[in-house]
């Protein structure tokens, strides 16, 4: 314990968040108690409350971390290529890589987030998570508008509904491929990669102008 007291507060918080993430992955958020997190992190429950007010605060930090990572993946995908199809392909690849490296975070990104900041009953992390989420939506919006201006994507797309459907379809395909990989291989004779490529192609064809869809 003497060693811990000399460590910065941020180190303790990171240790606890990391342990909580592992516990949430194993048991689920609702089934994980502060006692479970304390035990996994190697802290007493009393010490845990020195660094976090409650479990919701820990969940809020994890949600923020997940959104930051997603932002990085999307940003990286969009700056690597100029053509609409290539940028789309890299978005898909980035999302697959994100899910494979951070499966728990991938699921968290799809969860409900707080959007009511009129009252004072919200965590600072919740506002920042919302802000980053809006920045991601803006990037996807610009991607769609750019594709429409180039004549690659349909010009009748209603942008905001298109963005949410875009996320829903891509994330659903990726999560399904992760959960049902063995079934897909056995019943369809497709590898996970081939199944994903087919699904991503269907989504792209749904928003692309037919003459220019690949």
Where on the chain are the PLM-derived regions?
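C-terminal peripheral helix-coil segments that are non-catalytic and often amphipathic
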Residues: 97, 138, 142-150, 164, ...
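Basic, helix-initiating cap at the start of DNA-binding domains
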Residues: 1-27, 31-40, 57-60
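Short secondary-structure transition hinges
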Residues: 100-139, 161
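Base-recognition residues in the alpha-helical recognition helix of bacterial helix-turn-helix
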Residues: 25, 49-53, 65
């Amino acid at each position: 314990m003497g060693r811990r007291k000399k460590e910065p507060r941020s180190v303790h918080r990171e240790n606890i968040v990391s342990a909580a993430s592992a516990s949430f992955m194993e048991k689920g958020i609702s089934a994980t108690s502060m006692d479970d997190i304390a035990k996994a992190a190697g802290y007493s429950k009393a010490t845990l409350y020195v660094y976090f007010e409650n479990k919701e605060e820990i969940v809020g930090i994890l949600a923020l971390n997940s959104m930051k990572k997603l932002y990085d993946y999307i940003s990286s995908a969009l700056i690597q290529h100029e053509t609409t199809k290539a940028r789309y392909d890299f978005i898909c690849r980035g999302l697959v890589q994100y899910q494979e490296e951070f499966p728990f975070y991938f699921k968290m990104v799809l969860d409900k987030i707080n959007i009511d900041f009129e009252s004072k009953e919200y965590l600072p992390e919740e506002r920042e998570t919302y802000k980053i989420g809006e920045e991601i939506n803006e990037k996807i919006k610009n991607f769609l508008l750019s594709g429409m201006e180039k004549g690659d994507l349909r010009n009748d797309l209603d942008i905001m509904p298109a963005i949410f459907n875009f996320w829903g379809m891509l994330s659903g395909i990726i999560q399904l491929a992760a959960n049902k990989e063995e079934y897909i291989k056995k019943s369809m004779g497709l590898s996970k990669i081939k199944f994903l490529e087919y699904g991503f192609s269907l989504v792209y064809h749904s928003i692309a102008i037919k003459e220019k869809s690949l």
